[in-house]
Amino acid sequence: MSTSSLRRQMKNIVHNYSEAEIKVREATSNDPWGPSSSLMSEIADLTYNVVAFSEIMSMIWKRLNDHGKNWRHVYKAMTLMEYLIKTGSERVSQQCKENMYAVQTLKDFQYVDRDGKDQGVNVREKAKQLVALLRDEDRLREERAHALKTKEKLAQTATASSAAVGSGPPPEAEQAWPQSSGEEELQLQLALAMSKEEADQPPSCGPEDDVQLQLALSLSREEHDKEERIRRGDDLRLQMAIEESKRETGGKEESSLMDLADVFTTPAPPQASDPWGGPASVPTAVPVAAAASDPWGGPAVPPAADPWGGAAPTPASGDPWRPAAPTGPSVDPWGGTPAPAAGEGPTPDPWGSSDGGAPVSGPPSSDPWAPAPAFSDPWGGSPAKPSSNGTAVGGFDTEPDEFSDFDRLRTALPTSGSSTGELELLAGEVPARSPGAFDMSGVGGSLAESVGSPPPAATPTPTPPTRKTPESFLGPNAALVDLDSLVSRPGPTPPGSKASNPFLPSGAPPTGPSVTNPFQPAPPATLTLNQLRLSPVPPVPGAPPTYISPLGGGPGLPPMMPPGPPAPNTNPFLL
């Protein structure tokens, strides 16, 4: 006896199943073979009993609702139901029709065993056959009549054989032989189904192979993810490096362009603005020391080197009335043009006029306030009266010209201190300052001329410009004029008064206070430094002492040097 049959017997005893229920449980067991025809015939005979019928049908419906793993219980229960419908009581077919929905649900029965085979296909096919049989009344009647005839024949054959043989038990071969055609057909179907299952069963692989396959797949996936992350990181770093290189290249190109622009672009030199409207001076290649601009429009001249070793003067203030700083020369408001270079003209006399030569290059200055390089008036009148910001210079009043920009278009006419504009012999104005007593700036040129060597060429060392003084204009006859009286600042002259004229008849009455006549004898007076230095003739006695405004005075003057040779006679009236 098998283990499954022993377990069924134990359950039958425990649950106290009836004889009919035990037979149904035996016919619908989980064994791999189908129910025997004799057992099914006995159950069909019990269906005619009302009590046994209810027990049989309740157990069959219980087997039909079993779990998927007990698919054999379901399949054998449907086989037993079909047999009972054909050979059992009519109440079986009637109850099956009433509970047809329970059979119809089995059309969707699903179960796949561990080997991957679908075992629910047999249940689904059997359910379709039962539903079709229950719905077709004619077929049901025919099948039922045929099954009953077959059962009767089998019963008669069995009775005759049993009577002939005797009361001995039939052999085992006869017990295994199907008792009816239905049972034989059922066994044949079961055998075919089982053989088909065994043929369709694929070779199963061991669990170790599945584990190794899953492990290999997971390792391959991890390696792929790692390589993808590394590739993305490399792409990101490469992109950042390319952007950084582009930024550095752009910065280098911009800096190179700026360097080239700085190299090839020369900044424009600052141009000194002329407050009197004079033309801007042409810049030269020779560097000139920083000096105050000439307020009267005189061209700037680089100072020459001092042959006596004097300290290089520094630029002075442009105010003609304020004393200059002790460390540099003062700006001459009457400053002449620069001396010509070597080989271009004679060297000017340091004690004479500085307008003997004109600059070689550049247009002449059209400043109305600058002295002309040569004045043809034998009476010595100055071309114009200099003024500073509308104030009187040297004690003579002049009104500022509002059309100073147009003065360069007309010729400057000599004027005198009188309102009538008469030409006077000595009516020309003199600068408010006389050269300093110790100013030896012009000695270098005269010494170079006397020795016969050309003056030193212009060097970057700044030298003071050549000054034009009344003594240089008058020459040796400067003693005929009282320079101190002319330089001093007398009170304002009335507009209607005339300046003194030495050629005016003695009988003509003066119209107002006149300036002191230099030709009239005067009481003796103290000699001034200018008279001691420049006058070869004793000064006119009786001249009152006057204030001398030094142009370069103050501390830090160069040491006193012996005067140079007297300048040649330039007065056309002296024979």
Swiss-Prot record:
Task: Please give the residue ranges the record annotates as the region Disordered.
Answer: 150-186, 264-575
The record's SUPFAM superfamilies line, in alphabetical order, gives: ENTH/VHS domain
The annotated regions of Low complexity compositional bias extend over 157-167, 279-299, 306-316, 332-346, 367-379
Phosphothreonine modification sites are 420, 459, 463, 469, 493
A Pfam family of the record is ENTH
Q: Where is this motif: [DE]-X(1,2)-F-X-X-[FL]-X-X-X-R motif?
A: 401-410
Where in this protein does the record put region 8 X 3 AA repeats of D-P-W?
274-379
Q: Where is this region: 3 X 3 AA repeats of N-P-F?
A: 501-573
Q: Does the keyword Nucleus apply?
A: yes
Q: What is the protein's membrane topology class?
A: Peripheral membrane protein
**Swiss-Prot/TrEMBL domain comment:** The NPF repeat domain is involved in EPS15 binding.
- State what this protein does: Binds to membranes enriched in phosphatidylinositol 4,5-bisphosphate (PtdIns(4,5)P2). Modifies membrane curvature and facilitates the formation of clathrin-coated invaginations. Regulates receptor-mediated endocytosis.
Which named protein is this?
Epsin-1
What organism is recorded for this protein? Mus musculus
Primary gene name: Epn1
